[in-house]
A protein has these predicted regions:
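Flexible glycine-/small-residue-rich
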Residues: 6, 36, 110
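Structured interaction and signal-relay segments at domain junctions
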Residues: 19-86
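Short hydrophobic/glycine-rich mini-motifs in sensory/regulatory modules
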Residues: 96-106
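Juxtadomain coupling helices with adjacent low-complexity linkers
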Residues: 10-23, 52-62, 66, 70-71, ...
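Short, structured interface segments
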Residues: 1-10
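A short beta-strand signature within small-molecule sensing/ligand-binding domains used
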Residues: 85-97
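A short, flexible beta-alpha/helix-coil linker loop
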Residues: 2, 41, 110-114
Length: 138
């Protein structure tokens, strides 16, 4: 019996992405998720089995396809749920771009306090997405 698994270039960085997510989660004290185009491949700041391998929600796919970041500007606006079956909304999403192609996203999830991301939070998430994209190009 042969089982085919969809190839994910970002999946090759799985262990590396996991360490990066862990460090970001500790610095930001907020849950951080890293996804390839289809699934969560790394998480920190929450029980990993709660989110690993879960599918990217249509809202996340739209953000990635737009190649634009998403920032929760107004806590009263309707929330964006980035991962199917995960009940915390995203407060910041930055697509991971490698050689002009979208290969995933770094997601800052709402913490217990559901605060808006600070400017420093945004820059750290953006740096993570850019760094992972650059690693993909190597």
């Amino acid at each position: 019996e042969v089982i085919f698994k969809k190839y994910s270039p970002l999946g090759e960085l799985g262990e590396f992405a996991g360490v990066y997510a862990e460090v970001l989660g500790k610095v930001l004290t907020t849950p951080v998720l890293i996804c390839d185009r289809d699934h969560v491949i790394a998480a920190a700041g929450l029980p990993k089995k709660e989110v690993l391998e879960r599918r990217a929600a249509p809202a996340l796919e739209e953000i990635m396809e737009s190649r634009q970041s998403y920032i929760l500007e107004n806590p009263q606006s309707s929330p964006v749920y980035a991962v199917e079956g995960y009940d915390r909304p995203a407060v910041a999403v930055y697509p991971i771009l490698a050689a002009g192609d979208v290969c995933g996203a770094v997601i800052l999830s709402a913490g217990e306090d559901r605060r808006q991301p600070s400017e420093a939070d945004r820059k750290l998430i953006a740096a993570a997405a850019m760094f992972l994209g650059r690693q993909m190009e190597e």
